[in-house]
Amino acid sequence: MNKIFYTDGACSGNPGPGGYAVVSLEENELVYSYVEDFQHTTNNRMELMAILHVMKLAADDKENDYLVYSDSAYAINSITNWIYGWARNGWMNSKKKQVENIDLMQEIYQYVKFPMSNFKLEKVHGHDGLLGNELADSLASKNKQKYLNLIKKHNIIDF
C-alpha cells in the first residue's frame, strides 16, 4: 500500500520560534497528523525535521511504500543530492565550512546511505493549492483558522 505524506516547516524570525507538521490524507480523511514546535529554530531545520519524521516511520514499516511531498528545495536537494558529498568531505560544504544542521544531516544520512526502497521524496510548489501541502503549512505555521477553513471547504474528516 502507498502512504502519502505532506510535510512542511515554518519559522517566525528565522531563527526564531517555529515548528513542523506532517499530514497524511486518504480520500477525504486525515489519517495522520503530527506537529512539533520549537522555541529557537530555522525554517530549513523544520523542513528537514518534518521529512526525517516520515523517514523514521518508513524505516519501521517495510510493508508499505512512503511517498513524501515537500515544498522545500533546500531540504530535498540536501537529502537527495548534497548529503553524499558532504558525508565524503567530512560534513564540510563547498566553501570548506561545516554544513548547516549537521546533526540532522548525519541522522538523515543513516537512512539514505543505503537507499530505502519504500521511501520516495518529491518536490511540490508551496502555496499552490495542493490540499495536503496547505494543511501541513497551516499546522506548521500555527494558522488554525486556515486549517479549519481547509477542513470545512474540502469536507475532510479530521480525527
Label each residue range with its predicted role.
Residues 1-46, 56-61, 79, 138, ...:
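RNase H-like nuclease fold core
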Residues 47, 51:
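Short, conserved alpha-helix that lines the donor NDP-sugar binding/gating region
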